[in-house]
Amino acid sequence: MTISEFESYLEKGLGRAILLLREEPDKTPFREAALRHLCTCGYLEVSYELDLISCFEDAECLAKEAARQNLAAFRAEEGCWNLLLLHALGCQKEIEEIIETRYCQYREKIRTSTENISCYHHNRIGYINTVYTILGDCFPTIEQVKAILPDLAYFFSGATEEDNRNDVIGIYTYLDERFGKEIAEDLLEEGYTYPYGDTWKRLMARYEPRPVDPNITAEELIRLTHSHDRKQLDFCIRSFRAAGTNIVHAVAEAFFAESDIERRHELLLLFLGNKTIPFPYPNRLMDFLTEEDWDAVDPPNVNKRTQYFFSVLSLLAEISHPRVAAIGKRLREGDAFRELGIHMLNANYTPEDLDSLVSYLDPTFLNTPLFNEAVCTICCLSDKGIEGLPLVELISLFENIPAFLRQRLVSSLIKKGLFPNDLREECRYDRNPNIRELIKELS
């Protein structure tokens, strides 16, 4: 294994980087590349990096050097993405000290530098990133969260731009996902008080989703879709999901009656946001497509009609129908939306499409969305029981397949009883933890 091959395998997260390194009698030439990887990776799971460290005889020294360099980068605000690795290397205390110092600095600067817009903007971004670091990477206690809430409320109340307020709303959303949406309410109920408490309550009210209206009429729902407010659109999509068949059909009829492209697209968002609700009139939808729509996919004609047209095609993509198959073929033979054309084969594949599908596995398409879509489609069709697909042949391309698709391929091979033994050990050390789990279950 050459150094460049080793670096390529590490970058792709392939288990062969670990296996082949273990077989090297002299690992010294690979140490610098390994250290470089340990100081530039940014993954949400670090078993792969810990396996890499364990390959070296001086594993403890390598771990200390990786920790030292990552801490230095973190102090310089260049390495926040490696906190999980630093945790695994036992640097919890150092991380908390750096974060506490940084948090206090940014908090003070935000309160004193508002007269300098660029300085304020820089400190605002630093503050927000630090809060996310505390909440996301430091496994915070409830006391740490309590300490942050007053500053967030202050920041929200003093924000003059919508983006500034959206930053705080984003953090509240994160708190919701991490701790449950009742956290701020619970803190208030237990008597925890702070300045700007009313502001924080208003923030929570703004974030809180509008309850679904079970009695909403089709007319009101159609009217409300004409809004650029994200909360309003979310309400419409959730209400549409709970609506009866009559409302679904009424929205579809409103779409056909509408002449404005933007309004048509807004109505289609109700279906796109509810994948379980099929568009009730697919044939009429296909009839609705015009050559003007097709022209909109070709530069320099890309415009609002392009987005609308893509939404229509996305609704048709899962429908098994000769006309949809023809649309998919036209897309694959064109210059735009070819990935969607490949995706349409999931519901409309015939043996005659095999050559077209396989053509996207050509080396000229490696590392492109077209290659990825072709691999995904082959796995999907194989899982449906379709025979004659080059599923096993994909093994030869294994190192060129992204980690999330490697997982799909491994799963499909296992389902078909075609998973090769010589790939088992490599997958056992893949960066993707889900691939490791699949192999563990196979054993």
Report the location of each language-model feature.
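Eukaryotic acidic, Ser/Thr-rich intrinsically disordered low-complexity regions
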Residues: 2-14, 196, 200-204, 419-443
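Hydrophobic core/packing positions within alpha-helical solenoid repeats
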Residues: 38, 50-53, 83-86, 131, ...
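Hydrophobic core positions within HEAT/HEAT-like alpha-solenoid repeats
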Residues: 18-21, 35, 132, 149, ...
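Residue-level detector of extended alpha-helical repeat arrays and alpha-solenoid scaffolds
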Residues: 31, 128, 165, 230-234, ...
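Short inter-helical turns and helix N-cap capping residues of alpha-solenoid HEAT/ARM repeat scaffolds
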Residues: 161, 228-229, 259-260, 293, ...
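Charged, amphipathic alpha-helical stretches
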Residues: 1-73
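Amphipathic alpha-helical scaffolding segments comprising HEAT/armadillo-like alpha-solenoid repeats
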Residues: 3-4, 28-37, 59-70, 94-114, ...
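Extended alpha-helical scaffolding segments
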Residues: 125-150, 154-169, 374-443
